Amino acid sequence: MISKSTSDGAATPRQASGSVSGLAVMKGELGSLQAIAAPAERIAAEVRASEVIASDETSARVKGKTWWQWTFGCATAVYHVIAPTRGKCVPTDFLGGVKPKMWLSDRLAAQLGHAEEHQFCLAHLIRDAQYAIDHGDTIFAPAFKALLKDACAVGRRRPDLADATIAAHRRRLERQLERLLARKPTDTEGRKLRDAVYVDCSDKLFVFLKRRDAEPTNNESERALRPSVIFRKVTNGFRSEWGAKTYAALCSIVETGRRNSRSALTAIREALALPAAHAAGA
């Protein structure tokens, strides 16, 4: 993150130095940041080619207005976009007509309908269940929370389980969910949760048990956005759209490097070297 800020608290990428996920960026390197757009687009193409894509979003500040930072990731790459909207058009534009096999996200409506199947983040739903429990529901939420934690435990054990065993667990969990949805909570929050699960979630809870390369939670997407949340609080955002786009490209390169066991410094240097290497070979 380029964390050096101006007197009004807004970050400018032309400042003398800063940091990218804790990495110092020297003055001479900042002029090269425009060169990272092409490597970032190669990362986007890698994510689009994946059968399983996970996505999340968090707010950003650009020229004093609320924008949104989106992340689209697969096992080996993460692409960041900072856009003026939280609408469905952002993932639609990112995909460019591609339809992956599975999409992993929270329950935001803008995240729906982009893949053949959808896996809701079970960690989010476990928190929703705990909220209903804290507000007095004893009929649906406690058992629903236990069911989701059971599903996550099966997910962690998949490396040691045969495909047939995983399929049996999925059928068992689906039967238990069906019985749970027959319950009638009397507490308001319990009813809201049960109705939401019945209407929107019942076919999006255990999709990850159909694929070994899918996860039950969206924790990796949240982790990819965490440095940006800190950045927003420290700097109060960007004074230009150019700065926001450059920062998103940097996030793409650094987080993709992390997923491939490369340091932020190595990932950025490799990205900046790519155009020169291609030119040399031309």
Question: Which residues are covered by each model-predicted region?
Answer:
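Catalytic center-proximal scaffold of phosphoryl-transfer enzymes
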Residues: 1-282
